[in-house]
Amino acid sequence: NLRYGAVAVNHWAQQPMVTQDVDFVVAAEAVDRTVSLLEEAGFHSERFEWSVNFKGCSAVSLQLSTEDFYRDFPSRAVAADVHGILLRVASLEDTLKGKIKAWSEPERRQSKRLKDLADIARLVESHPHLWNMLTDNLKQQVQPPEKT
């Protein structure tokens, strides 16, 4: 399993933020098995066109992406200690690409797009070389990184 959303951003950014969901990806052939395992563990699942969302007993939900965009993320994932738990998270560049994709979706709620923009800014602040990956539109909305 690979974490690619806010959990990955919190790993790569210097200042972590709270998240209410864990976004993850598995190999395409493992989706049905993953859904079964989580349902057996007590999670309720709901399938959508691009994801399977899970809700358990806590306020934190899980979102399994089934979108082709994320298919190669696991091959570039890195091991990371996230709050004392060893996880595989999306590479730094893939984390940014995922956030840019989410921010670019016009049907997303404004509050989510603003959070995506903040996540993009946090990543660029922590890793200035990522500035070159931003679109011109994003460069107008995110401050350039400080030169050191």
Where are these regions (language model features)?
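Compositionally biased terminal segments of proteins
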Residues: N1-T148
